[in-house]
Amino acid sequence: MSVSTSSKNTLLSSIISGILSLVIFATLRFCADWFNGSQLNVLVGGYLFSWLFILSLTCVSNAEMLIFGPDFQAKLVPEILFCLSLTVAAAGIVHRVCATTSVLFSLVGLYFLNRISIKYYSTSVVPVDAPARKTAKKFK
């Protein structure tokens, strides 16, 4: 049984994004007191938690691609809402306002990820002109 290169890349990407999301959560949890310092610190925390969302979504999506096949795509209801609620809960542990700003930054990041994926992975259909039908001559 041989494993294809794309399967290896998907597995490696899933592992790396999972480890990085755990490292980000542990670091932000460890530095939770720093977020009480100023409003700018809270915004930075929300931005960093949005990276936690993106990395956890990458981990979950790549794991599902390994299980269900390479054509599987993450949908809004199960994957995106699960990762977003997980991120909001983790950010709420650190600071309540971090949870709110992380939702906003995560939605902006999700918008740009969607634009990038449409640009690189969508198949564009070339329109084919249908031959013109011959119409009967109209007599006046």
From Swiss-Prot:
Localization: Membrane
Function: Subunit of the oligosaccharyl transferase (OST) complex that catalyzes the initial transfer of a defined glycan (Glc(3)Man(9)GlcNAc(2) in eukaryotes) from the lipid carrier dolichol-pyrophosphate to an asparagine residue within an Asn-X-Ser/Thr consensus motif in nascent polypeptide chains, the first step in protein N-glycosylation. N-glycosylation occurs cotranslationally and the complex associates with the Sec61 complex at the channel-forming translocon complex that mediates protein translocation across the endoplasmic reticulum (ER). All subunits are required for a maximal enzyme activity.
Membrane topology reported for the UniProt record: Multi-pass membrane protein
Pfam families according to UniProt: Keratin_assoc
Highest taxon above the source species: Eukaryota
Naturally occurring in which organism (per UniProt): Drosophila pseudoobscura pseudoobscura
Protein name as it appears in the record: Protein KRTCAP2 homolog
Summary of subunit composition and partner proteins: Component of the oligosaccharyltransferase (OST) complex.
Alphabetical UniProt keywords: Membrane, Transmembrane, Transmembrane helix
Family affiliation: Belongs to the KRTCAP2 family.
GO cellular component, one term: membrane
Transmembrane feature ranges: 11-31, 40-60, 74-94, 98-118
UniProt KW Chaperone keyword: no
